[in-house]
Amino acid sequence: MYASKYKRGSSNYQRRGYSRYQGFRRTAIVTRHDGKRRQHQSNKSNEDPKMLVQCIRENQFGPDFVMSHNTAISTFINYPQLGKIEPNRCRSYIKLKRLRFKGTVKIERMHTDVNMDGLSPKIEGVFSIVIVVDRKPHLSPSGCLHTFDELFGARINSHGNLAVMPSLKDRFYIRHLLKRVLSVDKDTTMIDVEGSTLLSNKRYNMWSTFNDFDHDSCNGVYANIAKNALLVYYCWMSDIMSKASTFVSYDLDYVG
């Protein structure tokens, strides 16, 4: 599944004496082996395209990324397609290096409520972005991703220390968590969100593999990923009637 493993042959050379033709024979042997080695490397380079360091960007915004108060959204990061147009991948696996994201979230009051003092209450709430690694991606019987409540127990848990449910820890784990606590008097406010998580380092490499059954299935979406998909969970919790609209750009650095 990953890079091919090569077996290195070994040879032991034992000196038994010297001959005036020995140097010539050794030179001939080295030349012959070197020629074979070069031919093997040339054929290998023609068969296996070189994997390149690339970056694929995805913008998540629009009606599908608008949440009313006390709701959550689950989605995923698209991976590169198999093909020749960059950003692409040339094999059925890639090495994930780093995921960066940056964007804005717009919080709006949906209805103007007035308290006893004749003033509108503050918009108070917690907005969260959770990056989750799915070790063995596959859709549930309903054909959907796991919901926020299924993965973390309940949306209210975003107020505290968020953790994956014990029964799902073998498959999922949190890679990055961003939380913004809001308390504003305005009916509309904008907040900046930004983060980065390192997926591979000098001691550990994270690889993702794909189910490339046919040409149409090599598109890098969640159903195409066989190992280590990246999921994104958005959650907006507030007691005030409001909504959160996100516009977030994700940059995935990879080798593929």
Curated annotation (Swiss-Prot):
InterPro entries: Gemini_BR1 (IPR001530), GV_A/BR1_coat (IPR000263). Residues 150-187 are annotated as: Interaction with Arabidopsis thaliana NSI protein. It is a peripheral membrane protein. The keyword DNA-binding applies. Keywords: DNA-binding, Host cell membrane, Host cytoplasm, Host membrane, Host nucleus, Host-virus interaction, Membrane, Transport, Viral movement protein. Disulfide bonds: none annotated. It is found in: Host nucleus; Host cytoplasm; Host cell membrane. A motif (Bipartite nuclear localization signal) lies at residues 21-42. One of its GO terms (biological process) is transport of virus in host, cell to cell. The keyword Oxidoreductase does not apply. Its main location: host cell. A motif (Nuclear localization signal) lies at residues 81-96. One of its GO terms (cellular component) is host cell cytoplasm. It holds the Pfam family Gemini_coat. One of its GO terms (molecular function) is single-stranded DNA binding. Belongs to the begomovirus nuclear shuttle protein family. Binds to single-stranded and double-stranded viral DNA. Interacts with the host nuclear shuttle interacting (NSI) protein. This interaction may allow NSP to recruit NSI monomers to the viral genome and thus regulate nuclear export of viral genome by NSP. Binds to the genomic viral ssDNA, shuttles it into and out of the cell nucleus. Begomoviruses use 2 proteins to transport their DNA from cell to cell. The nuclear shuttle protein (NSP) shuttles it between nucleus and cytoplasm and the movement protein (MP) probably transports the DNA-NSP complex to the cell periphery and facilitates movement across the cell wall. This is Nuclear shuttle protein.
